[in-house]
Amino acid sequence: MEHNKAGSSGQCPVMHGGLTSASMSNMDWWPKALNLDILHQHDSKTNPLGADFNYREELKKLDVEALKRDLKALMTNSQEWWPADWGHYGGLMIRMAWHSAGTYRIADGRGGGGTGNQRFAPLNSWPDNANLDKARRLLWPIKQKYGNKISWADLMILAGNMAYESMGLKTFGFAFGREDIWHPEKDIYWGSEKEWLAKSGGENSRYSGQRDLENPLATVMMGLIYVNPEGVDGNPDPLKTAQDMRVTFARMAMNDEETVALTAGGHTVGKAHGNGKASNLGPDPEGAELHEQGLGWNNHTSRGIGRNTVTSGIEGAWTTHPTRWDNEYFYLLLSYEWQLTKSPAGAWQWEPVNIKEEDKPVDVEDPSIRYNPMMTDADMALKIDPEYRKISERFYKDPAYFSEVFARAWFKLTHRDMGPKARYFGPDVPAEDLIWQDPVPAGRKDYDVNAVKAKIAASGLSISEMVSTAWDSARTFRGSDKRGGANGARIRLAPQKDWEGNEPARLGKVLAVLEKIAAESGISIADTIVLAGNVGIEQAAKAAGVNVTVPFAPGRGDATIEQTDVESFEVLEPLADGFRNWQKKHYVVTPEEMLLDKAQLLRLTAPEMTVLIGGMRVLGTNYGGSQHGVFTDRVGALTNDFFVNLTDMSYTWKPTGRNSYEIVERKSGKVKWTATRVDLVFGSNSILRAYAEVYAQDDNKEKFVKDFVAAWTKVMNADRFDLV
């Protein structure tokens, strides 16, 4: 390699391009290849705290009251390098917490403030997150002081809570328990646009039809948290903005009342910044020069701080007293007429007509100067949209009710992605169970598990019926927002009992048998369903010549319909399940990509996904009894036949349709088996084939069974946060 000789004059001895994005990656060369990286995130190799670090144990050492005092003191400790507006950082800290939690979307449970992901790209450099890097730097001395006893994820949300409390709001509560990640998430789809703040209708737009927002997205533009504050595509029209708000907030699991409360409560304090030229700002943190040390949007042309700060481009406060919690927002919004104007930075905003001098907020640095308050197009939507207006009027007339609704909505916003209360920690956890937490009562643990297994084994249910039902119950789990799973046995309730993918007729038959056993044994149906799956696997392993006991942890409870938000659970309905070789219909996304997404939500690794596919196929668990991918003559025995036959070169593979293939004997031309894309990707993709070959080896038959059991148990216990 003459061009890279270490001794050559003036040349770097490091291979050029290998350590940066200058070289082409495999995904650049083969963009249609499966990106298995989404299954291999956030492991101990990237975590500087090590594999043995236990955040919950560290939390037990935390002096919560001291931390809260330090945060409240921070609010009014203005720093010269980034001065606090009116001497109070509350508005900035609330915006940081809002924008951390506000990326959550209900469709796939991804986003949100549960991982501290705002520290990393792309979120740390989203246009809507401009200058939140300053908020995190202001928090750094506190993080440094308390160290491992408080995660960045918890600290950012708690800072928002303390900001509100320091300005007079009685918050609903707070739970610790969010664990930090250490690199950007690779599984979250933020949109296909190639530029920030791309308008709808352009290339790779997230909108189609009559402004139909692409699923699972919950924000109107690449780089915004929810709606464009200047109006749809930057064109002011409060009624159209109201439509966007209704869609985006619904996709964050909020109703109209919560939407009005969160918008108003978020704008009751603080201000927007646009008193200058946006063109004077430097690159975002991810694109800034080395010497900027991770700070972005720096203004080296003009003063750029205090009253001269530019962030969103919109300029001004919403209320007369932006550092206290009160009802001035609704007073100003509803008492005055408002007219369109532009900020010094050129952004559209609304200002009041003939406002009283005493209703104007003072300058952030000089209290002798007063300016007009402002409203964004989203604020005006609360006044113009008929339904939002009714809610706003009620909040205006009843400030106490507004404060209560906001406090609850803020708690929901900042905790929705944490999952069940079993994950909550700390002295301020509310005692009340909330329906959006998907509450599940505790189940019995003190019973004879083997006696129940014996009843199940004698029930007449087939291996396929037992395993399929247990899988369907557990597969709803989402590691993103910790919802779903087998605990609660909601598979027997609406809407899950009627989902097409759950085969209602087969499900009803199996549940009738298992519910009777559960009642006789005095245990939960949830435990019985999982136990039945385990019994089926043990029988199948024995048929393959391997004796194994599938681990089981009793204690699941049974949720009631009163504890179940039916509409909220609709988003958990599987559109496809590669593990049971099923999809509801053909989609633009390939079946193997949907399998990968499901595996990631289940928190499976690629080897775990592989071994589960091979086992589920030979157990005969395909939807509707389909024979696709059942590469065995011993259905019901937990053998490695799927992998043996998939890698056997005495067969060829021929497409017969969009998602169907035939496995043909090379010599005779006889069709031996049929398959789908999900089956054949394990022989096509080079990485998955490497795993498949491991399980096809003669010396790994027992390893296959043990690995299948381990992966199965991981899925069955995915939602058992009470065991952690």
UniProtKB/Swiss-Prot annotation:
The record marks 95 as: Transition state stabilizer. InterPro entries: Catalase_peroxidase, Haem_peroxidase, Haem_peroxidase_sf, Peroxidases_AS. Keywords: Heme, Hydrogen peroxide, Iron, Metal-binding, Oxidoreductase, Peroxidase. Heme b binds at residue 267. The active site is at 99 (proton acceptor). Binds 1 heme b (iron(II)-protoporphyrin IX) group per dimer. The keyword Iron applies. There is a cross-link at residues 98-226 (Tryptophyl-tyrosyl-methioninium (Trp-Tyr) (with M-252)). It catalyses: H2O2 + AH2 = A + 2 H2O; 2 H2O2 = O2 + 2 H2O. The keyword Metal-binding applies. Bifunctional enzyme with both catalase and broad-spectrum peroxidase activity. Belongs to the peroxidase family. Peroxidase/catalase subfamily. HAMAP family: Catal_peroxid. This is Catalase-peroxidase. The gene is katG.
